[in-house]
Every structure is written in C-alpha cells, then in structure tokens.
A protein has these predicted regions:
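Generic structural signal for short, flexible, solvent-exposed coil/loop and linker residues
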Residues: 8-9, 127
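N-terminal secretory signal peptides that target proteins for export/translocation
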Residues: 1-8
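Bacterial N-terminal signal peptides
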Residues: 10-22
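C-type cytochrome heme-c attachment and multiheme electron-transfer modules
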Residues: 22-47, 51-222
Length: 222
C-alpha cells in the first residue's frame, strides 16, 4: 500500500502537467504565427501583423483593410482561384480577410515587410503562391448563396455558432475565406490553426450528428 500511496500523487502530478501542456498549446504564443523569437520581429509577437499607430487603412485599390490596426505590407497579386464544374478557371478577387493572410502566404511579399519597411525574409513553409486552383475556393470563387444551397449549411447558423464565419468581398458579398476555416491566433489550439478539430466527431451547427470531418461538415451537408 505504501508504494500505491507513493504512485497516486505522482500520477496526479503527471495528469496535471499534461492538462497544463494541452492548455498552453492554445494561443499565438509558441504557435507557427509566433514570430517574437526572431530578431527581425524585434522580439514582438504582434508587430509583424499589428501595430498601435500609423497602420494600413486601405489597400492599393482603396479597399478598407479588414484586419484591425494592420501593419504588414499587402500583396497586390491577382489569384487564380478555382476550376468550376465546367472546367473553366475562375480568376478573381479574394475576400478582404484572406488578403491579410496572403500578404505572407502567396510569397510575393516578405514576411518581415511591415511597418513601412521592405523585408528580406521569404516564407518557405505554408507557401501557397498565387495559383490557388488546387486549394479550397475562396473569395469570388466561393460566394454565398451557393449554386447548390441544399448541400450547404446556411451561413447564418455558422456565424451564430461563432465558427466557420463567412467573410466579405469588397462589394459586400459574403464568401468563404481563409479565416472561415483557420483561426490565425490559434485560440482553439488545433492542428493547422482550425476553428474546429476536423478529426473530431459531434453535432454540427445545424443539428446533424457526424462521425469525423467535423469542420468540413459544419459547412457541407454530406
């Protein structure tokens, strides 16, 4: 019994450490978006994307920037978005939120290009380029209402649930964007910074019970 009494506190301590480690994984600190460890970021986590003063209000086309107090140089690239059912390539604009993500992830702007300065550090991991035809459609290629609404969940339900939000194009139309699936500040602590763990099972926002692909099925009725 003495050895058992010795073991139980030890097991509890291990469990507590594991729980704390799991909690610590959520949030931007220590995530792939934590650039504070690099000298070019001046050891500040937020600065490459946000700043308190003299920030970017509009892009080169006069479109109001979606990100609050945005500090990173925006891309001016044009994107190939998707191949439609007829095999035609959709080339167009992305939503204003995705423009912020692509200012690093399309590879046309250096990661350390912020605060009005020209950077030299090019993104290597997570590089999408400007040809997005092999990625989930976003922006003008993924506008709601969908041509097949019976296969899609009403976006009002998703937004009300606080997950999978639609984003706005410059003309005000709602569309799927990068941040419909990804939470860039890693608040959920999930793989690939997703709003919902896609390996999970459970109840979707419209009440369907699904087994696996929970993130996908919060939008797609399958």
């Amino acid at each position: 019994m003495k050895s058992m009494r010795t073991f139980l506190p030890s097991a509890s301590a291990v469990l507590a450490v594991c729980m704390l480690a799991s909690i610590a994984q959520a949030g931007i600190s220590g995530s792939k978006h934590d650039f504070g460890q690099f000298g070019w970021a001046k050891n500040q986590i937020c600065l490459p994307c946000h700043a308190p003063h003299n920030t970017i209000v509009k892009d080169a086309n006069g479109v109001v920037v979606a990100g609050p107090l945005w500090n990173h140089t925006l891309s001016t690239a044009t994107y190939d978005l998707y191949y439609d059912a007829a095999g035609q390539k959709v080339t167009g604009k992305v939503d204003t939120n995705s423009m912020l993500c692509l200012s690093c992830h399309d590879g046309t702007v250096a990661v350390d290009s912020f605060g009005g300065g020209a950077g030299t550090q090019q993104l290597t991991a997570g590089l999408l380029g400007t040809d997005l035809t092999n990625d989930h459609p976003i922006g003008e290629a993924a506008v709601w209402p969908n041509p097949n609404p019976s296969f899609m969940v009403d976006p009002a339900l998703r937004t009300a649930a606080g997950i999978m939000p639609l984003r706005n194009l410059a003309d005000g139309r709602a569309a799927v964007g990068c941040t419909s699936c990804h939470e860039p500040h890693n608040r959920k602590g999930t793989l690939h910074m997703l709003w919902v763990n896609n390996a999970g099972s459970g109840t979707t926002v419209d009440g369907r019970t699904v087994s696996g692909s929970l993130l996908c099925q919060n939008c797609h009725k399958k």
